[in-house]
Amino acid sequence: MSKHSSDLNNLISHIALYDSESAYKQFFKYLFPVLYRFSYCLLKSKELSEEVASDVMITLWKNRKNLPELENVKVYALVIARNLSLNVLNKHSRHELVSIDDIEIEVALDSLNPEQLLINGELKKRLEQATQSLPDKCKMVFKLIKEDGLSYKETASLLNISVKTVDAHLVTALKKLALVLHMEVNLLWLCI
C-alpha cells in the first residue's frame, strides 16, 4: 500500500470514527478537484460540475460511518459523480451545455529563464487545447488515468467498458497528443 493510500485511509478513519471536520477538509481538498474534472468531462459546464462534485462530497459526509467498509472510496465517489452527472444530462438533454474550463497542468518552473517560461506556457496552452480536442471517451480515459491516477481496471469499471477498450482509448489519446505536441515543438523551434 502506498503512503498516499495509507494517508487517505487514515483520513477516512478519522472522518468515520471521530466525525473529524479537519480530516474531512483535507479529504475534500484531495477529492473535490478529481470529482469536478470527471464531472466536467461529462457535463461541459463549470457550474454543474461544481454542483455535482459538491453533492458527492455531501453524500460522502452523510455516509461517513460506512466509508471504511468500502474497498476504494475514490472509485465509489467517482461512480456517484458519474450517476449524478448522467442524471443532470438526462434533465438537460434538450440543452447543449458548453463552457470553457482551464485544466491546470503543473509545470516545473525552477531555474527557467523568461524564454523557457514562454515556451513552457505555450506548450501548456497547446496541451490543454489538444486535450480538449480529444474525443470525449478518449479525453475522459486520459484524465482518469493520467491526471487522477486511476488504474485501467478502475477506469473500465467506472465507465462500464472493458479494460482493452480503456487501453485503446488511452493509446488513441496519447498518439493524438504526441502528434500535436510534436508539431508544436517543431513550430516553436522554427520561431526561435
Model-predicted regions and their roles:
Residues S2-H4, L158, L174-I192:
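C-terminal edge and immediately downstream basic/flexible tail or linker adjoining helix-turn-helix-like DNA-binding
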Residues K65, V79-V98:
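Arg/Lys-rich amphipathic alpha helix in sigma70-family domain 2
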Residues F28-K46, N63, T131:
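Amphipathic, Lys/Arg- and hydrophobic-enriched alpha-helical face
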Residues S5-L8, H95-L117:
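Internal acidic/polar
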Residues L17, M57-N72, K91-H92:
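Sigma70-family region 2
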